[in-house]
């Protein structure tokens, strides 16, 4: 069983989407169920509407799930599991205040040591715990042995007990911490493989320790994906616009192109342009590079142009909101436009009223002739016919003709454009 477990606390990051895609692919390859779990226990940071937005984005990418869970609905199980650990003396109530802990952290810092919980409350007698009326958290006792696990990408990893420490699993408000809720939910939902970002590597031994302490002995496999760097080689921040999947989609980049790029990023693929369904046939999680991958927006835009060309004409007309068949013309313009947004602007420029500027007189002459000119099969015949009838030459012929046909003074060669725009010339002359 594979899962994708986002939090509804902001726009989906491309790193999260990459994890979703990889989990989905692996689930399909192994004919296993795929879980979508919304991790909403951090109520203060949750943003209204983001849960639905996550589902909408996954649907756009063709990612479906067989099971859907809301983490906060498992709260009673989290509390039951925490109580079980306390009753078995594997966890304990900690009454240390934030101020007391902060003072100990500062002391460790001055001494040049890494802070570790000193076990103050672990030593309390049961009667002292029962009689104490102070707010408390629940801490899980640190493991007694080295925690080891195998990662499909990073290989063998191990963590010593002192690096895991006695960590908090339940807060003072009786809600679970991230690691506890995540570990318990993965156990309850029978998750067998976790693919996520490498920023979660340090969480893995804690989650393994939680499940082991609860007596769960089913093996879990892992793959921690390397971080995505920006174009300057720095870890991509959520504040950078193109780290947001929503921003990429609103910019006119196709879901299929984004998926293509994220699968290819830091990975060896048999070809450069492919669909998600094609990738399912050959994708190998162990082939993903250990090294951080640098995000290249130009490369993504190049891939997007190729995916636009792959779209069926009737579908592209719908995507571009066109009421006529302009798909082939739009695909021709991918030499200049890289996104759906840019293609819409190109089509609007062609079929909207134009500004003739200094060529107003020449444009009027050409428009009259174009209203019923014979639409020759090749551009040279068309051009020569128009030249002879208009009596215009050079710049005063080609510039106004370009404006009438494209709405711009610069653009592709008219001879290249002609086959795609030929059938619309009479219409353009009447705008």
UniProtKB/Swiss-Prot annotation:
<dbReference type="GO" id="GO:0006424">
    <property type="term" value="P:glutamyl-tRNA aminoacylation"/>
</dbReference>
<keyword id="KW-0436">Ligase</keyword>
<dbReference type="InterPro" id="IPR020751">
    <property type="entry name" value="aa-tRNA-synth_I_codon-bd_sub2"/>
</dbReference>
<protein>
    <recommendedName>
        <fullName>Glutamate--tRNA ligase 1</fullName>
        <ecNumber>6.1.1.17</ecNumber>
    </recommendedName>
</protein>
<feature type="short sequence motif" description="'KMSKS' region">
    <location>
        <begin position="235"/>
        <end position="239"/>
    </location>
</feature>
<keyword id="KW-0963">Cytoplasm</keyword>
<dbReference type="InterPro" id="IPR000924">
    <property type="entry name" value="Glu/Gln-tRNA-synth"/>
</dbReference>
<dbReference type="GO" id="GO:0000049">
    <property type="term" value="F:tRNA binding"/>
</dbReference>
<feature type="binding site">
    <location>
        <position position="238"/>
    </location>
    <ligand>
        <name>ATP</name>
    </ligand>
</feature>
<dbReference type="GO" id="GO:0004818">
    <property type="term" value="F:glutamate-tRNA ligase activity"/>
</dbReference>
<dbReference type="InterPro" id="IPR008925">
    <property type="entry name" value="aa_tRNA-synth_I_cd-bd_sf"/>
</dbReference>
<dbReference type="Pfam" id="PF19269">
    <property type="entry name" value="Anticodon_2"/>
</dbReference>
<dbReference type="GO" id="GO:0005829">
    <property type="term" value="C:cytosol"/>
</dbReference>
<keyword id="KW-0067">ATP-binding</keyword>
<dbReference type="Pfam" id="PF00749">
    <property type="entry name" value="tRNA-synt_1c"/>
</dbReference>
<comment type="subunit">
    <text>Monomer.</text>
</comment>
<comment type="function">
    <text>Catalyzes the attachment of glutamate to tRNA(Glu) in a two-step reaction: glutamate is first activated by ATP to form Glu-AMP and then transferred to the acceptor end of tRNA(Glu).</text>
</comment>
<dbReference type="InterPro" id="IPR049940">
    <property type="entry name" value="GluQ/Sye"/>
</dbReference>
<dbReference type="GO" id="GO:0005524">
    <property type="term" value="F:ATP binding"/>
</dbReference>
<dbReference type="InterPro" id="IPR001412">
    <property type="entry name" value="aa-tRNA-synth_I_CS"/>
</dbReference>
<keyword id="KW-0648">Protein biosynthesis</keyword>
<dbReference type="InterPro" id="IPR020058">
    <property type="entry name" value="Glu/Gln-tRNA-synth_Ib_cat-dom"/>
</dbReference>
<dbReference type="InterPro" id="IPR045462">
    <property type="entry name" value="aa-tRNA-synth_I_cd-bd"/>
</dbReference>
<dbReference type="InterPro" id="IPR004527">
    <property type="entry name" value="Glu-tRNA-ligase_bac/mito"/>
</dbReference>
<comment type="similarity">
    <text>Belongs to the class-I aminoacyl-tRNA synthetase family. Glutamate--tRNA ligase type 1 subfamily.</text>
</comment>
<keyword id="KW-0547">Nucleotide-binding</keyword>
<dbReference type="InterPro" id="IPR014729">
    <property type="entry name" value="Rossmann-like_a/b/a_fold"/>
</dbReference>
<feature type="short sequence motif" description="'HIGH' region">
    <location>
        <begin position="6"/>
        <end position="16"/>
    </location>
</feature>
<keyword id="KW-0030">Aminoacyl-tRNA synthetase</keyword>
